[in-house]
Design a protein with these regions (language model features):
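A structural "domain/chain start" motif
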Residues: 1-37, 47, 125
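Surface-exposed short loop/turn segments
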Residues: 23-28, 32-108, 112, 116
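Amphipathic, coiled-coil-like alpha-helical scaffolding segments used for oligomerization/assembly
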Residues: 118-125
């Protein structure tokens, strides 16, 4: 049994990240056997920056960052606001299709780690 239940999830910004979050948190929806019922407002962002370039000025190393802000609402009152950030460095690839696949896989792994932290945070409230 869970110690909390999620009534509603409002998702803002990055669609792919939000879909993954919503899917992972759905096991906590509408559990009547708990005393804590939360509404969540979740905003997520994904960014990619160049960390270094080669001698030709082409990107050599990238930084991928995923940030998620969560507002936990209980009885129409904000109970907790928290930001979660994860990032990863990776080398450029000549095959842009492979680069995109790697970026998406890396972002997905970062989101998984943040989801674990979100669940721990909700359990601690």
């Amino acid at each position: 049994n869970s110690i909390f239940s999620i009534n509603k999830i409002e998702l803002l910004e990055e669609k792919n990240i939000n879909t993954k979050i919503k899917s992972s948190l759905k096991i906590y929806k509408k559990n009547d056997n708990t005393k804590k019922f939360y509404d969540l407002s979740i905003s997520s962002k994904r960014s990619k920056n160049i960390l270094s370039k080669d001698s030709n000025g082409d990107p050599k190393i990238f930084l991928l960052n995923v940030s998620i802000e969560i507002d936990v609402i209980e009885n129409n009152t904000s109970k907790s606001k928290k930001s979660f950030n994860k990032s990863a460095n990776y080398k450029n690839r000549s095959n842009k299709f492979e680069l995109k696949k790697y970026e998406n896989r890396t972002a997905s792994n970062l989101v998984d780690k943040i989801i674990e932290e979100i669940i721990v945070h909700l359990q601690s409230l």
